[in-house]
Amino acid sequence: MPSDLPTPDAALRAVSAPEHNPLGTAGLEFVEFASREPKALGETFTKLGFKAIARHISKDVTLYRQGEMHFLINAEPDSFAERYAEEYGAGICAIGIRVANAQRAFDRAIELGAWAFEGERLGAGELLIPAIQGIGDSHIYFVDRWRGRGGQRGGLGDISIFDIDFRPIEIDTAHADLSHVGTGLVAVDHLTQTVGEGRMQEWLDFYRDLLNFREIHELHANWHVSAESRVMVSPCGAIRVPLYEEGTRRTNLMHEYLPDHPGEGVQHIALATDDIFACVEQLLANGVEFVEPPPRYYAQLDARLPGHGLDVERLKRTHVLVDGEIGADGVPLLFFQTFVRRGAGEIFFEIVQRQGHHGFGEGNLSALAQARAES
């Protein structure tokens, strides 16, 4: 079943509703990573099914592609990314948000109190992409050039930033690389962020006032947030940001599955797939390791979600957790998730699939805690 993320066409339609979407937000254009060991991070991306398809024309930045995702590894010396990696280790140092007009979006954000990011040096022929400072020393870029914006797949008047600022690694496969399937990961489902103790409201206001995000319960009335988290969603529906506040009570189990980010910033990134079982089986074949839930977790599943209709043995083999509910019509509304085993100083990845459920696995934390207690 397809994921619940809006299609590119649906995200583009949101641009034409200025009363709800004044920036013309239309999804994520890229996620930028910094690391003290960029080569090792690139190898991780390759295991996850991404392909290095282009390099920046003037900087040591590599573009990786899979599904609708663009991941950048910024290894430029004496750059913001290098300083970020020295301070925080491997992490997400910036995101690029598609908007109707980048300069207008930037100017509006500055007028509302955002701080400008002055950016790095520009090489010859390189685009100036406006950006503001985001959470935890990260940056948010506003991008108004992306493929498909004009209803086409490339061509004059429909050129992305990657057509201008990057050069293909393999000319012969450049066009095919734009549709790289990899392991079946298709999009970024959400970016979980930690905020400083006592600063939750400040960051809620940041997303609401500057970017026009809304809390998820405003969009899905039957969705209940936990006392320790809030979830913000972009006007186009394609960007989800769960927020957790530092200093709140965390169990040892949550630390294992959701390790703390050192300071404010992106704690982990969740990647969506349309078939989590096939995807994870391919990832396992690629050498990716996953956190293994206690066996008791699966023994409780029938009682917790009667009528789920799932192959429990396959869930076990792939280390997949499932949360959700059975709808009034008897149709299961499910959220699948599994966590890539994370080494010290590595990026934390989650793999998810949605079947009509808008949650983030809240029920799995209590189910895992119970399973641990009974094991």
Predicted segment positions?
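Vicinal oxygen chelate
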Residues: A26-S35, E82-D107, P130-I132, V186-E197, ...
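Beta-rich nucleic-acid/ligand-interaction surfaces
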Residues: D60-V61, A221-V233, Y297-G307
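Beta-propeller domains
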Residues: Q193-D205, D209-P242
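Acyltransferase donor/substrate-recognition loop-hinge adjacent to the catalytic core
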Residues: I140-T194, R214, A238-P242, R249-E256
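Conserved active-site tyrosine of GNAT-family acetyltransferases
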Residues: L41-T46, A109, F206-R208, L283, ...
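TerminUS-proximal long segments
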Residues: P2-V15, Q337, R341-S375
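An N-terminus-focused feature that recognizes amino-terminal "leader" regions
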Residues: P2-R149, G155-T173, T318-L321, Q337
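Long compositionally biased, domain-poor regions of proteins
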Residues: I239-L243, P262-R341, I347-R354
